[in-house]
Amino acid sequence: MTVRQLTTTDGTYTVSGEGFKPKGKLSYEGVEVTDAKMEQLQSDLSFRLSAACMSLCHNSQISKVDSRWQAIGDPTDSACAVLGWKINGDVRKFAQRHSRIHEFFFDTTRKRMSVIHEYEGERWVFSKGGAGGFLPITDWKILDGEIVPIEPEDIEKASIANKEMASQAMRVLAL
């Protein structure tokens, strides 16, 4: 399993790479994201938190053994961790810099996994799971670096993106 797309409030990024090898690039509208552009994206709170969620909200171990990358853990978690690695670098080192305080394991009632981490001097809850598990609890969004109330059209836009990706036989997760 490999992450192929990352859709944020700013648009959809395609992701290159194979399997659990944490090598690959993001592209936006067909143009590869350069290191300079990635630095700019990392200054955007929404993108940065999405990338942090990929790097922190999992229990997988990604490692290179005998020149081959492999993952120990849930394949979905592992695919997310690999995307986190492509954006933030080694997820093990990233997690060491942002200590985990608590975990709420995935369960079929909540339909999501959540973790609390120290991140950028504050405690943040990072969650990932099926989009339906987020709808009842989604009240806020990040717009231009500010946390603002979510609007009905935002939910509709996310629902359309979800259906579009699902129609391409993609497993869709919400962050």
Residue ranges, per PLM feature:
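Conserved cytosolic headpiece of P-type ATPases
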Residues: M1-L175
